From Swiss-Prot:
GO terms for molecular function: methionyl-tRNA formyltransferase activity. This is Methionyl-tRNA formyltransferase. One of its GO terms (cellular component) is cytosol. NCBIfam families: fmt. Its EC number is 2.1.2.9. Attaches a formyl group to the free amino group of methionyl-tRNA(fMet). The formyl group appears to play a dual role in the initiator identity of N-formylmethionyl-tRNA by promoting its recognition by IF2 and preventing the misappropriation of this tRNA by the elongation apparatus. (6S)-5,6,7,8-tetrahydrofolate binds at residues 108-111. Belongs to the Fmt family. It catalyses: L-methionyl-tRNA(fMet) + (6R)-10-formyltetrahydrofolate = N-formyl-L-methionyl-tRNA(fMet) + (6S)-5,6,7,8-tetrahydrofolate + H(+).
Amino acid sequence: MRIVFMGTPDYATTILEGLLEKFEVVGVFTQPDKPVGRKQVVTPPHVKKFLIEKNVDIPIFQPSTLKSEEVYEQLHTLAPDFIVVAAYGQILPKEILQLAPCINLHASLLPKYRGASPIQHALLNGDTVTGVTAMLMDEGLDTGDILAYDVIDIQNSDNAITLFEKLSHLAKELTPKVLQSFENIAPIAQHDVDASYCKKIRKQDGQIRFSDAKVIWNKYRAFIVWPGIFLENGLKLKEIDLVETDNTHEEGKILEISDAGVVVGCRRGSICIKSVQPPSKKAMEAVAYLRGKRLKVGDTFF
């Protein structure tokens, strides 16, 4: 069975590892290298980095767009039985979809959270379950027929890092099952009426106010990798805990200072801030930050 794989981040890498163990992967498509960080160091995608580090001898393609005759010819020459897609970052044009069955491993229980950030949105909304859907791709955005899915619980301690890890391994196990039993699967159409969509995360999405502790906690979990959570003045809250979600407090009032951190009240609930990072400075313990600002219990945290 000849497989072409399309994927970019570490979620995709885990799925690719599973394919390499059981199938003939004849080509890998991933996004172009791009500048990363303040110094704008040109960095390869996680999938490419993995293949190079493991000395895997498979052709790697990094087109800026799939809508070209060159890409079509490359895929046609590879003659795949299946094209497996996981967080690739581009929509496949009709011509490619017609080359071979294209199966997408989407990190949500479709039709919920179609789009670019399903894991973050499951956390943002405080969901208690999520999963991976294997979908037969069409020209829409995550609208294809469902081939299979698997479900896991979301723990309150989960964040984007842990959930990405769990779902990538779930997808790694699901993908071979779908490929091996593809001819016997009856695809199920998605119910569009139940669909929801999630956009790419923007930096400004990480800004918070001390209004609802549960909302802050869910943002912290969802944005722990990027963009983080921060106040209007740019102060990043690097590490926090949820204290309680029921009591009413003055917004941003410092309720308690201890070695464990700084408890700050919200209009609903409270959080414990353990460490912060002022703009253009290194991260520090929240208690040390308060000392520098000469803030005490009863003051407003800023």
